[in-house]
Amino acid sequence: MTTKIKVKTSESDWHKRWKLYYLRHHGAQLEVQIGSHVCDVLLPNGQIMEIQRKPLTRHQIEARELEYQDRLNWVYDSQFFLNRIVDQRNEKFSNEDFHFLPLDYRFKFIGKTNSIVFHREPVWIEHKMSFYRLITWQFNGRYYGKFKERIDTY
């Protein structure tokens, strides 16, 4: 049986494969209007997956965070974000910047494209820090844990 999913015609195969994955394996809803935004994937547990292949502006990130709160997760294509995601493991975190930590992770259904998933760390929201941690269930040898103002690699 072939599963068809309704996606924007401008979306890449990478986007479509991710959406199909969540639809088939997690029973997700796609392209759901929540407030003023349309989220890519809405999981049955209420978590939202935003699938992103190009950098967003700070305003675009903050607008989604304001709308989705702590339900927001990001799936990034690390092939395209190689020079745009900042690994700040040994530096202080700034309120002015968003920090993303890359992890090499390969999904069989995605093919050669490495992808990474991030979720907002609630404790850092309270302290007005803009930091994303890796979701640990997507683990392939390197995990970044967060402790105060530094990140240790396991």
Segments from the language model and where they lie:
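Non-catalytic C-terminal interaction segments of nucleic acid-processing enzymes
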Residues: S78-Y154
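Hydrophobic beta-strand segments of well-ordered beta-sheets in folded domains
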Residues: G46-I48, D70-V75, V123
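Structured beta->alpha junctions
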Residues: Q33-I34, R53
